[in-house]
Amino acid sequence: MIVVTGGAGFIGSNLVKQLNAQGRTDIVVIDDLTDGTKFVNLVDLTIADYMDKDEFQARIVSGDEFEEWDDGIEVIFHEGACSATTEWNGKFIMEVNYEYSKDLFHYCIEREIPFIYASSAATYGGRNDNFIEDPKFEQPLNVYGYSKQLFDQYVRRWMPEINSQVVGLKYFNVYGPREQHKGSMASVAFHLNTQVKQGDNPKLFEGCDGFPDGGQMRDFIYVDDVCKVNLWFWQNPQHSGIFNCGTGRAEPFQNVAEAVIKHHQQGAIEYIPFPDHLKGRYQSFTQADMTRLRGVGYDGEFKTVAEGVADYMAWLNRA
């Protein structure tokens, strides 16, 4: 069985979709459906089983071998987390993102099960120079980023003793289908689309940190491309480590807004004051250093903002 934690969430459900496209349906989704709206991400997918994340964690900790699943667990894609960068309940974040990840990690390395997990570019924080997979370049701005940083550090300490595949992927700004349940944490493309559909102009922040209005830049990566990287590592088990998962290109938020406007053929960008609560806690620039990912042989192409947002708009506004 293939296990996808967070499988009803944004990246997890897209990963299940790509696995289905490869003919794999022996998939167990692990998630927390307290927010029942996430079920819509699964209705067009084929899976073998679903399990609540708390039950799964309890069975993992107890050393359960999941004999009801044929041949046990083949791989764990660990996409489940509290991904809200605005969540400041540190106890909750550390339990869900750090402790849970450690439990899965130890279960996998003890049984030599491939373990591919979601890290985050939030570990880099407000740096605007080096986005290289090295602790000296990490300075997270929020407790979410810290929880991801700490788990990366934990994995790095264990790596010399591990005989099976362990891969951490530092996701940059991911956008695309099946993120509607994320509310305020959904991508800028999602929110701008909603604004234009409601007859409003798409709104971007005024300039800050030396960037012009709408000119703050991020490494935006389409969710399909993120899933392809995950699956490539699983198919290349000789590679382990922590890798950036971005495009290597920083593009301004203005490019996202222009792609949304182009799809709808209406609207003009409006600039709004930069929120006080984000000052000093905002990444005005991110750009993945792709040296390590390319160095292990990943040669897939990444959509530009214009290409990816066009695909996403077609999906969001389908009849």
UniProtKB/Swiss-Prot annotation:
Example of a GO MF term: NADP binding
Pfam families documented for this protein: Epimerase
CDD domains, per the entry: ADP_GME_SDR_e
Catalytic activity: ADP-D-glycero-beta-D-manno-heptose = ADP-L-glycero-beta-D-manno-heptose
SUPFAM superfamilies assigned to the protein according to its UniProt record, in alphabetical order: NAD(P)-binding Rossmann-fold domains
Cofactor note: Binds 1 NADP(+) per subunit.
Annotated residues for binding of NADP(+): 10-11, 31-32, 38, 53, 79-83, 148, 174, 182
Active site: 144 (proton acceptor), 182 (proton acceptor)
Metabolic or biological pathway, per its Swiss-Prot or TrEMBL entry: Nucleotide-sugar biosynthesis; ADP-L-glycero-beta-D-manno-heptose biosynthesis; ADP-L-glycero-beta-D-manno-heptose from D-glycero-beta-D-manno-heptose 7-phosphate: step 4/4
Coiled-coil zones: none
InterPro entries per UniProt: Epimerase_deHydtase, Heptose_epim, NAD(P)-bd_dom_sf
EC number in record: 5.1.3.20
Keywords: Carbohydrate metabolism, Isomerase, NADP
GO BP terms, alphabetized: ADP-L-glycero-beta-D-manno-heptose biosynthetic process; carbohydrate metabolic process
EC category name: isomerase
NCBIfam families reported in the protein's UniProt record: heptose_epim (TIGR02197), PRK11150.1 (NF008360)
Purpose: Catalyzes the interconversion between ADP-D-glycero-beta-D-manno-heptose and ADP-L-glycero-beta-D-manno-heptose via an epimerization at carbon 6 of the heptose.
UniProt domain comment: Contains a large N-terminal NADP-binding domain, and a smaller C-terminal substrate-binding domain.
Protein name stated in the entry: ADP-L-glycero-D-manno-heptose-6-epimerase
